């Protein structure tokens, strides 16, 4: 339920634009972040341990061990198709990258979300547009970013 409420709040408060094509990894990743008490009640639960979504972490680790997450970040950046073909993988990687960015590159992540919400109404973004927009905020070494994300997620206790 908190996940769906997070979507509504994000759209109602302008974090996402209802009239724009929001990359699904962005909206679902943010909603999965909000499923934890450390995000929705951060004053009472300020520890990073309270911000870790344990079920998403377990899912990501299981899928990674099975070799199903490697290279999927670029795929998510290019299109939303992975949510149709392998939704568990899509949600796991969306949570992992969102958690990594929120914990390690928060200013850039917030800037990305802010600018994504202002990209214009009723625009369809090509695969190149979607990746280019991400690269402008986080750099062109997507493979390196994915490696750093994996190291970070693997380090979580």
Write out the residue ranges for each language-model feature.
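Active-site recognition of the HExxH zinc-binding catalytic motif
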Residues: 1-12, 31-32, 98
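Acidic/His/Gly-enriched intrinsically disordered linker/tail segments
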Residues: 18-157
């Amino acid at each position: 339920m908190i996940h769906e409420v997070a979507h509504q709040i994000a759209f109602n408060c302008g974090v996402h634009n209802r009239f724009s094509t929001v990359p699904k990894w962005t909206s679902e990743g943010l909603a999965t972040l909000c499923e934890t008490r450390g995000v929705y009640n951060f004053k009472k639960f300020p520890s990073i341990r309270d911000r870790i979504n344990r079920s998403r972490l377990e899912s990501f680790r299981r899928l990674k061990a099975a070799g199903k997450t490697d290279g999927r970040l670029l795929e998510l950046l290019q299109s939303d198709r992975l949510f149709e073909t392998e939704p568990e993988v899509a949600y796991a990687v969306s949570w992992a990258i969102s958690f990594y960015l929120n914990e390690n590159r928060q200013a850039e992540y917030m800037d990305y979300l802010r600018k994504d919400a202002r990209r214009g109404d009723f625009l369809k973004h090509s695969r190149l547009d979607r990746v280019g927009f991400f690269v402008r905020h986080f750099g062109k070494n997507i493979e390196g970013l994915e490696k750093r994300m994996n190291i970070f997620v693997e380090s979580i206790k």
